[in-house]
Amino acid sequence: SGEVVFKYISKHAPEGVRPIFNIGRDARPEVIKRLKTLGEVVYYEDELFKFYFLMADKIISSSAGEFTINAMEKDRPYFIDLYNFDFYFMNHGVNCGDCSNWLNKFNKNIHIFFNTGVKERQAIIDGRYDYTEDQCVITGLPRFDALYEDTRKQLLILPSWRRSISGAYDEKTSSVYFDGFVETDYFKFYNGLINDERLLSKMREKGYKGLFCLHPIFMKQYVDFQNNDVFDVNEGFVDYNKVFAESAAMVTDYSTIAFDFAYLKKPIVYTQFDQKQFYEDQVYDKGFFEYETDGFGPVCYDLDSAVNELVELIDNDCKNKYIDRVENFFVNID
């Protein structure tokens, strides 16, 4: 979303407005190069970033991490009087969970809180966030504008990560290889799914290929998963717009990236074999979005039911039976 907004503002900025994109030096070189063709880029590791931070009138971000709104970190008390910006929060994704303990006004002081759905917006207004109706606006996610269609016979499996599998990440490097990963229910479920003979047989029969993409935090565990003639296990960077465009259907669990796929009106199957533990371990609570009644596809709680749903879906050429829910959630699909 940040790149989409930066591109638009750089092209349409009124006189006197100076948009600057902040990024880390460890970002992919092609991403940095692409951003520099759009406008001015500054690295958050540099002192220049802190200068621009103190000069900013507005900070627009899809991240609400502490560094986004406090570049001076532990030196904040010495500079707080120079913090004169309004924080516009684009959201990392659709806010379907209750993040009020984290995103409330007293913690993040969001000036404008962008939303995608009517229920999403109302949950924030009615919840413990303490934002007014005027501060919560429905715009959709900027990245929706970059979505496109190029549908092929491809099944995309894209699950979220698990906070409970703490050995597979750390706070600094994000992703580290964890020897115990193969003993987790998470690994056993998804490795079982991409190697299930009933599913593979149906995909071969119908001419489908599969793509399994791990969350970036679990990326180093790709070597644990068994490849076969149907499924490829992605080993690195994922161009989400490309895989969304090319996939006919998606399997995911709790990832809000499913809303991007649903925006394309393509079918989704949710795999929530660990629902109770997931919400006990994550940093947010269940919110307004009930997958069983609001979700854009069936919810499966075990491997057999997931395979059954996918076999039926592929047998019916991935026809979306949940299109009404999609159209009811999104205010505008253009």
Model-assigned labels for residue ranges:
Residues 1-147:
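Active-site and donor-binding regions of nucleotide-sugar-utilizing enzymes
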Residues 223-229, 254-330:
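Catalytic binding pocket for nucleotide-activated donors in carbohydrate/polymer assembly enzymes
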Residues 20, 42, 60, 88-90, ...:
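Hydrophobic/aromatic beta-strand patches that form the interior of the parallel beta-sheet core
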Residues 72-93, 173-182, 266-277:
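A short, gly/pro- and small-residue-rich
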Residues 333-334:
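C-terminal alpha-helical cap of glycosyltransferases
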Residues 2-5, 10-13, 137, 141-224, ...:
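Conserved catalytic-core segment of nucleotide-activated headgroup transferases in glycan assembly
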